[in-house]
Regions:
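Conserved catalytic core of the tyrosine transesterase superfamily
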Residues: 1-203
Length: 203
């Protein structure tokens, strides 16, 4: 699944980052401390990225009021299309998010993920955190926010989810974008299915 980053021939399309294996994703999250304020925030932040498929700009644009834990929805004010969207997240993010909210809610309105002073977290801080945790977890590949988005897409496809549904989850403007995004896996799946297909015998 290793992919080299390169210029995409399709203008404006996303370039898939290298996805993590399930073991790597688990190790990355385990590397975040559950005993410190920043560790609890970082673990929740990374878990939501991983289990929602949000872009980093979408995640950091969230306000506390944009989160509905009962419905597991996130109201996005800042999206690539420029239009507000409602997106969801997997129940696997519940525990890490609830632990963070116990610290976050008493601070009042503001960014969902913030500094101790209540200010915004910047993309470069998230990238640095991912690099630090990846090193601590012994992950050799470069771990970036977009890689977590790609990891979710890969896991959904392998779980048998339809590309049209994955496209909606990721907030892609078209299914064609998602198809290019997962092209390496859909090609492999097509070959596997062809080899296993129950076709009429040739006489």
């Amino acid at each position: 699944l290793t992919q080299k980053r390169h210029r995409n021939a399709h203008a404006g399309s996303e370039r898939p980052a290298e996805p993590l294996t399930p073991a790597e994703a688990a190790a990355l999250l385990a590397a975040a401390s559950r005993a410190s304020w920043s560790g609890i925030r970082d673990r929740a932040m990374i878990t939501v990225l991983y289990r929602s498929g949000l872009r980093i700009s979408e995640l950091l644009g969230l306000r506390l009021a944009d989160l509905d834990t009962a419905a597991r929805t996130l109201r996005l004010r800042h999206t690539k299309s420029g239009r507000p969207q409602m997106r969801g997240y997997h129940p696997g993010a519940d525990d890490a998010l609830e632990l963070w909210l116990q610290l976050r809610r008493p601070m009042g309105p503001g960014p969902l993920f913030c500094t101790r002073a209540g200010g915004p977290v910047w993309p470069q801080q998230v990238r640095a955190t991912l690099a630090r945790l990846a090193g601590r977890a012994g992950i050799a590949k470069a771990v970036r926010p977009h890689g977590l988005r790609h990891t979710l897409a890969v896991e959904l496809l392998r779980a048998g989810e339809d590309i049209a549904v994955i496209s909606k989850i990721l907030g892609h403007s078209s299914i064609a974008t998602t198809a290019r995004y997962l092209d390496h896996l859909t090609n492999s799946a097509a070959l596997t299915r062809l080899a296993a297909a129950d076709l009429p015998p040739l006489e």
